[in-house]
Amino acid sequence: ADFIRQHSASGQLVGRSVFLQPPYSVPETDLSVLLDVLCQDAINADITRVQGAEDVYFYSTQTMTANYADMCVQVVENDICRAIAEAVRFDGRTYPRPYKVAMLTQPPYSFESQQITAALTAMETHPDYADIRTVESSNAEPYLFSERFMSYGKAYGLCEWLEVEQYQNP
């Protein structure tokens, strides 16, 4: 549990597969029981799991939110398109606001600009991301928004305010 807490405090998940490898080398049958007990123990109530496509990941809710853990799963599993879409949809649903593309270069994502460009190109034709659209402010700062949560006009107005107009109004 402390191992998971330490990793969570530094913004990292712990994959289940870590415990199968040296130096831990916990047998599969023992590991399942151990992790189930760990997650159900009242003393370790902060330890929870999130299911990824490739592994199950563990983190402590004392230092990491479920949303951040979900973002980390997408980064660890290198699912850049899904990571971008989920970030855009989360901001649109929660705040609502468009998502600044430059934010994808920051932690927990830390994507390179080439990765972002390639992912956005792939997303343009993929049906799972049909709701994700681009919008640009008058100072040419790119943003993304989800048509599930806002129209192009609203996204444009908000990104224009964020990038230009708020600085022109005292």
Where are these regions (language model features)?
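C-terminal non-catalytic scaffold/interaction domains in large multidomain proteins
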Residues: A1-P170
